[in-house]
């Protein structure tokens, strides 16, 4: 299956056409014909373009289609078609044991053959939340999850697994920065259009190579921080807004044990503390109270910058994920997402830029906002979603393993299944 996804993803990248005018009926016809092409060998020469078949010969295509049938049973019917342009859209095909989404791209010129095809989402017919939770519980290391429906009275907890367990959440902490920025804008203290210098560089991200001091709006920094998880943007915003104010948002948004994670470290400070050369400093920091930690940061500021970090010493294996981290429980993260739902304003479109899951799965929702976090031994995913009928939900989950890197695609697949089940 991994080979299939990789092959189809390659097609999606290599064979994307220039979008031109084409009749909707032509696209719908190609969408309908996808069912028969997936069902049995034959007709590939008239369905796919020469360009497609040069990249994926008929024999290879038939093997890929057969692999899908082996895993999911016979294709039964064409499901929903979500047209994005006259030549591009997402087509769902219902198999015996799953519904699979494909991005389908047709040539704008007659005979409008298919030039791009990419598998973008799978929803098993026989799936249920108990199976998803069992899959999460079976992961090595520690896992925790909370799923809630959100309303005027706050979260109503639907599914939980160690939901009050403090977990390392990686870049999920950037949602606290976003929340404080949204609060400051709503209070008239800041404007999204305010310009500040890019003043604190960190690994990694696009802005690392941007000139020091480059003028950037708060909105641009927030977008880079959330959609790209840019650490330079996060550190610049955290310190520009004021660490004290962002720390206050941790409690304001409903974190049950803020002292476990305060003060919120910049990413550069976290990288520096995780370095083997700073092991004694890290132990002192982890054992200290929040006020003592703040004093440690101030006293050792020169050692806790990106320029002092040997990134190779902390980038390959899980490092201090139980002591130098941004800690929260799944319930804490759900309450933060609910705060953003009620108070986020223009922060919500920023959260929706990167959905965190395949496009076909994300489009099951009226709104999908996402921010996750990952590093060796850590992955966290946090979703704020609105169903087609207007109901709001939040899902927050983390997987920590201090002994080994985590299997990120496996975790993403489990969370995608949970979202798809919730969307039904």
Regions found by a protein language model. Give the residues of each.
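Short, low-complexity N-terminal intrinsically disordered segments enriched in polar/charged residues
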Residues: 17-37, 126
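Short solvent-exposed beta->alpha transition segments
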Residues: 42-87
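Exposed beta-sheet edge and beta->alpha loop/turn motif
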Residues: 83-131, 414-418
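Beta-lactamase-like hydrolase cores
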Residues: 120-165
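Structured C-terminal helix/loop/strand segments within mature extracytoplasmic catalytic/sensor domains
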Residues: 121-139, 311-424
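Active-site SXXK
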Residues: 168-196, 395
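Short, glycine/proline-biased beta-turn/loop segments that scaffold the active-site neighborhood
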Residues: 187-214
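Active-site-adjacent helix/loop patches that line small-molecule binding or acyl-intermediate pockets
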Residues: 213-305, 331
């Amino acid at each position: 299956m991994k080979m299939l996804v990789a092959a189809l993803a390659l097609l999606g990248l290599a064979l994307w056409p220039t979008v031109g005018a084409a009749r909707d009926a032509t696209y719908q016809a190609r969408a309908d014909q996808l069912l028969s092409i997936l069902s049995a060998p034959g007709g590939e020469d008239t369905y796919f373009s020469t360009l497609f078949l040069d990249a994926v010969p008929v024999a290879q295509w038939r093997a890929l289609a057969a692999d899908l049938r082996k895993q999911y049973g016979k294709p039964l019917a064409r499901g929903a078609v979500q047209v994005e342009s006259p030549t591009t859209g997402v087509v769902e095909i219902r198999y015996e044991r799953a519904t699979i989404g494909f991005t389908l791209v047709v040539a704008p010129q007659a005979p409008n053959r298919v030039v791009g095809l990419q598998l973008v989402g799978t929803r098993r017919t026989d799936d249920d939340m108990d199976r998803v939770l069992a899959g999460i519980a079976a992961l090595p290391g520690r896992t925790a999850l909370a799923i809630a429906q959100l309303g005027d009275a706050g979260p109503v907890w639907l599914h939980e697994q160690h939901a009050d367990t403090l977990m390392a959440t990686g870049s999920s902490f950037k949602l606290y920065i976003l929340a404080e920025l949204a609060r400051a804008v709503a209070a008239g203290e800041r404007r999204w259009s305010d310009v500040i210098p890019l003043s604190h560089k960190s690994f990694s991200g696009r802005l690392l190579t941007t000139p020091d001091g480059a003028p950037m709006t708060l909105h641009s920094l927030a977008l880079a921080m959330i959609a790209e998880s840019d650490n330079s943007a996060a550190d610049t915003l955290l310190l520009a807004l004021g660490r004290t104010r962002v720390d206050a948002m941790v409690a304001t948004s409903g974190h049950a044990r803020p002292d476990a994670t305060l003060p919120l470290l910049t990413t550069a400070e976290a990288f520096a503390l995780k370095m083997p050369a700073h092991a004694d400093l890290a132990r002192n920091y982890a054992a200290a109270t929040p006020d003592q930690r703040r004093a440690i940061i101030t006293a050792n500021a020169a050692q806790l910058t990106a320029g002092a970090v040997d990134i190779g010493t902390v980038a390959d294996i899980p490092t201090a994920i139980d002591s130098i981290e941004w800690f929260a429980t799944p319930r804490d993260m759900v309450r933060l997402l609910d705060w953003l739902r009620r108070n986020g304003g223009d922060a919500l479109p920023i959260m929706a830029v990167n959905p965190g899951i395949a496009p076909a799965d994300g489009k099951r929702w009226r709104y999908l906002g996402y921010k996750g976090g990952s590093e060796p031994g850590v992955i966290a995913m946090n979703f704020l979603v609105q169903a087609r009928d207007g109901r709001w939900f939040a899902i927050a989950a983390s997987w920590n393993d201090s002994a080994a890197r985590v299997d990120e695609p496996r975790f993403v697949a489990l969370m995608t299944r949970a979202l798809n089940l919730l969307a039904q």
